[in-house]
Amino acid sequence: HTPEGFRDAYQAFWQAGWPSLSCAPDDGGQGLPAVLECVLYEWLAGANHGWTMAPGLLHGAYECIKHHASDALKAQYLEKVATGEWLATMCLTEAHAGSDLGLVRTRGVPQPDGSVRVNGSKIFISGGEHDLTDNIVHLVLARLQEPGKEAPSGPKGLSLFLVPKILPGGKRNAVVCERIEEKMGLHGSPTCVMRFDDATGWLVGEPNKGLNAMFVMMNAARLGVGNQSLGLTEVAYQN
């Protein structure tokens, strides 16, 4: 559970339309300039950095899904992420694969129905589990393990998968938070170790082109870190 008041604050936040400021109107957004979103997250980070971590990855996830996911995935997830009704994560790092993503071992095995079964573990996942929203959309970097065909080694063999906490139809997916990471600060944000045990997911973009799609989200996250830093610096200066 997140700290008292976090869920109520987040529900009011997304229902008022704040996460969708710069998303396209056709996707449930407002179509406003991205600079307004930067100002918003600067203020929010200065007020409560831990809480602000939750929606901080939303726009990157929205852009990633919009530009790389299939039409079927967009129909199911794009508007939910654009409006902030569902939150999202960026699942890259593994215990043995930090800055060198070429060492990623998590696997996605294709299924006859077009889905994949994802198996592996990810660490340092911001917002990997929480009670702020009814669903969490995990974007997971892994290797596509097709029958009789091994993915290329290194970063060129990575694919991207969308793995929801709750599956269409309401069933809980086989993805769990094993533990919360110990940190020096930012305790209001759950940084999780996530385990995928035959979790159902779907390929985002082309096979073995996962980094291309994930960089859309990563670049947005980098801009978000700048906004957070500015907000924290501003409130430190004011006080």
Give residue ranges: language-model regions.
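Active-site-adjacent bridging/hinge elements
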Residues: 7-18, 37, 115-118, 202-215
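FAD-binding core of FAD-dependent oxidoreductases
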Residues: 28-30, 47-62, 82-93, 97, ...
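Short Gly/Pro-enriched turn/cap motifs at secondary-structure boundaries
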Residues: 96-99, 129-131, 151-152, 183-190
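Amphipathic, small/basic residue-rich leader segments at the start of a protein or domain
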Residues: 1-56, 72, 76, 80
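A glycine-rich, basic-preceded beta-loop-alpha segment at the flavin cofactor/substrate interface
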Residues: 124, 166-183, 190-221, 238-239
